[in-house]
């Protein structure tokens, strides 16, 4: 490995970048005509659950120790904010999300919750699916219209 990568930080960086690229491609492949934001949210959460079940939590804990990765994650968070704005606007247009959402505040709150979960190793104290279910109820269901709630509840019943 160290013939290709000079140090562990470079290796981890490449793994994270490649994994992010793979996830992005999978989501883009999934998003076909006829699907909506609720379908996509649940698909992404399924992928995250599968990944979390495959990866040792120590891996996630290790990532925050490297400056190059911290910079990458900060840049990724900015890009994800832009994608979130577009995604919520799409959900509003589709009639699944409320139109009176302060997207910047919403984005900050969801990011802070994710950071809290990781920084406090909540996944070691609670079942990951319970964390996910609570996250969905707090941050997805709360911005749904009645139409969105009905579909989300159905999707959640199938998932949980």
Name each model feature, range by range.
Residues 14, 18-21, 25-54, 107-110:
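Hydrophobic alpha-helical connector segments
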Residues 12, 16, 20, 70-81, ...:
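Amphipathic, non-transmembrane alpha-helical scaffold segments
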Residues 30, 59-63, 117, 121:
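Secondary-structure edge/capping motif, primarily at the C-terminal ends of alpha-helices
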Residues 86, 90, 94, 123-160:
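C-terminal peripheral helix-coil segments that are non-catalytic and often amphipathic
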Residues 43-50, 59-62, 137-143:
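Helix-loop "lid/cap" segments that line or gate small-molecule binding pockets
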Residues 78-113, 117, 121-123, 146:
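Hydrophobic alpha-helical bundle segments that form small-molecule/ligand-binding pockets
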